[in-house]
Design a protein with these regions (language model features):
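Compact mixed alphabeta submodule
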Residues: 116-234
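OB-fold ssDNA-binding interfaces and closely related basic DNA-contact patches used
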Residues: 1-142
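Serine/threonine-rich low-complexity intrinsically disordered regions
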Residues: 3, 21-24, 32, 44-45, ...
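Compositionally biased, intrinsically disordered low-complexity regions
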Residues: 22-23, 37, 66, 223-228, ...
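Intrinsic disorder/low-complexity signature
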Residues: 79, 145, 239-241
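Extended acidic low-complexity intrinsically disordered regions
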Residues: 2-18, 235-254
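Short linear sequence elements within intrinsically disordered, low-complexity coil regions
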Residues: 16, 30, 56-57, 173, ...
């Protein structure tokens, strides 16, 4: 006979451990708040490396649960979901076009940044629009390399939430250059850099293929050849903001 008291203790132990692990993982990220957040973007430890890591994420819903899939095309490999995405756009069906939008791989960029409010090195996870504003600084003679530790610039992330999605159009560097911090602070920050490249864990081709075949079954006029065994019917949903931070981060370990 099952000892329910012992089973309940084990259940609490497992759920608390899982919850704690996810909380620890999320604590590494800088979650931008509505209004202004001041950060100092940090360079890579090695000069020949980029200060950011780039990925593209298919965020898919299956049985009411969302999961992130890092697209193989980031590494130059083939992606069944991207093949389906382009195929759906070649049809005349608006439903197919909506499905294409829901499975689209959306660019994501990870950067190491000092959160000025706390002084901690965090992972800044941003979409293409905000990343583009950061890159603009490098090609602007008034700013240049804003990650320079001696004469770079702090960056103001201004997050407005008036419409359906967050707006970052007012984000910009501070007007004057400055040292990132004291020598001791800089040394500590550079020793605390997160392994942002390790966040990009490319999804397995076979898993993506099964997902693509399952989505194809819901499309109109795609000529799909039967159900995929063991694959639940996915739901397309609506197009999502590439700045949906919390939902993105909670699934990032998957």
């Amino acid at each position: 006979m099952v000892n329910l008291d012992e089973l309940r203790k084990k259940y609490e132990e497992v759920t608390q451990r899982n919850s704690g692990g996810n909380k620890d993982f999320l604590s590494k990220f800088l979650i931008t708040k509505e209004g202004t957040s001041i950060v100092r973007l940090l360079p890579a430890k090695n000069e020949d490396e980029n200060f950011y890591a780039e990925t593209a994420i298919h965020r898919l819903e299956n049985d009411g649960q969302f999961k992130n899939y890092h697209c193989p095309r980031v590494k130059g490999d083939k992606c069944p979901l991207c093949d389906l995405y382009y195929g759906l756009w070649k049809t005349d069906s608006e439903d197919n076009h909506n499905l294409a939008r829901s499975i689209k791989a959306r660019k994501r960029y990870y950067l190491n940044a000092v959160e000025r409010e706390t002084g901690d090195v965090k992972i800044l996870s941003i979409g293409m629009k905000l990343f583009g504003k950061i890159l603009d600084c490098f090609f602007d003679d008034d700013y240049g390399d804003i990650t320079d530790l001696e004469k770079g610039f702090d960056f103001k992330i201004v997050k407005d939430i008036n419409g359906a999605f967050p707006n970052y159009d007012k984000s910009a560097p501070k007007p004057r250059p400055s040292e990132a911090g004291s020598g001791a602070e800089i040394a500590a920050w550079m020793d605390s850099l997160h392994d942002i490249k390790n966040l990009v864990k490319i999804a397995e081709y076979d898993e993506l293929k099964q997902m693509a075949m399952a989505y194809e079954l819901t499309a109109q006029g795609m000529g799909s050849a039967g159900a995929v065994q063991g694959t639940s019917k996915p739901s397309g949903g609506q197009e999502k903001s590439d700045d949906d931070y919390l939902s993105h981060l909670k699934n990032l370990e998957s």
